[in-house]
From Swiss-Prot:
Residues 49-139 form the ATP-cone domain. Belongs to the NrdR family. Pfam families: ATP-cone, Zn_ribbon_NrdR. Negatively regulates transcription of bacterial ribonucleotide reductase nrd genes and operons by binding to NrdR-boxes. PROSITE patterns: ATP_CONE (PS51161). The gene is nrdR. A zinc finger (unnamed) spans 3-34. Keywords: ATP-binding, DNA-binding, Metal-binding, Nucleotide-binding, Repressor, Transcription, Transcription regulation, Zinc, Zinc-finger. Its cofactor is Zn(2+). This is Transcriptional repressor NrdR. Binds 1 zinc ion.
Amino acid sequence: MKCPYCGFEESKVVDSRSTEDHKAIRRRRECLKCNRRYTTYEKIEDIPVLVIKRDSNREYFDKTKIINGLVKACQKRPISRVQIDSIADEIEKKMNNDMLTEVKSEYIGELIMEKLKEIDEVSYVRFASVYRQFKDINTFIEEITNLMSDKHIGKIKK
């Protein structure tokens, strides 16, 4: 590992520990020439996931797009940024665990709606209206009716 201060290529590891999310190893190194310390991270290389858009174009999965969509849907709702990040992390983790290399954008949208339905119905309807491209008020009413019906069925099962 090349020292960022003097460029010398030999160092010793002074400390090594796992990051909080256990996805990387943080190493404190000391240059054997200038004796300065620096930090490096070692992590597993992610397999890039391609998202197949509605128009059949493909682009690399970008978690920030999920976060941005959730932030808009949850605006002025009692949903914390931690919850939003958690939803995005769960979706990314699911795709990585399923070892998907290509995924339709519809699949990601459905996962997001599933999570939103569990935490906030208003945010769910907001997201669904954009994702499913609601054309008029009747589409909103239909979605809300379905949501209320699902909620009623859930109470009966309990």
